[in-house]
Amino acid sequence: MIPDFLIRAFLIQALRIRYANACFAMAVVAMTAMMPAPSMPQQAANGSTPSAGTVTFTLDFPQSDPEHYSIAIDASGHGRYECTGKVAEDSEEEAYRTEFQMSAGNRVRVFSLAKQAQYFTGAVDSSNGKLAFTGAKVLSYQDGQRSNSAHYNYSNLAPVQQLTALFQSMAATLEYGRRLAYYHRYQKLALDDELKRMQTQARNNELSEIQSVAPVLQEILEDSSVINVVRARAKELIEMGNSVAAGH
């Protein structure tokens, strides 16, 4: 039989161990509460995400139509087109704005060319005063760390030349979309000639991002009051835009 004093000693030791464990657990909780929370990026702490890059092309060319336009493309491919000009000869000059989603291939191309052009940090204009004026152009790049702009009439830099050609062909497409929406609403008889010109330029690879004007082309295609030849032209352009956007 175990003596009583040994039992009491055993119980006292067990209580001491439980007390020590409890104190240790409380100390761990207290130390955890005193530790600072893991740091977050400054943008997240401010409730916003890190800013992505945006490439913008602007053209100002008096006596042309439109006289002013700009196209901005962000890193996700979301595009915004703004212009000021007449949509038709007998219309008033007005501001116009539309948004679209750029094809993945051209989105990658835009940002690759911007990188090759060092995000427009250096001299871009050729400084050749003998060249004809073709409009005051600006290429700009903005992200969380940079905000650069380059002004030029003509550039000898291949990446800038390619960006200029791409943005101008996009603007031509978006202007077709603007005019088609106007003609569809007010002058349906003008649709055939307009779509015929658009088809010719598209077949000659003079237009980019045809899918960006697919909504107005679809409206024309589905309008039974429009003659069949016009609707057929709209359908062909929709298919061309879908093919290019899919990378075919």
Residue ranges and their predicted role:
Residues A22-A33:
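Bacterial N-terminal signal peptides
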Residues E94-Q101, A150-Y152:
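A short, exposed loop/beta-hairpin motif centered on an aromatic-Gly-Thr core
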Residues N46-S91:
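N-terminal secretory signal peptides
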Residues F57, P66, E93-R97, Y119-D125:
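N-terminal post-signal-peptidase region of extra-cytosolic proteins
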Residues M1-R18:
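N-terminal secretory signal peptides that target proteins for export/translocation
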Residues A37-Q63, A123-H248:
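Short, well-ordered, aromatic-rich surface patches in folded extracellular/luminal domains
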Residues R80-T98, K196-T200, A214-Q218:
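Acidic/histidine-rich, surface-exposed loop or edge segments in extracytoplasmic proteins
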Residues Q42, A104-S127:
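Charged, amphipathic alpha-helical segments
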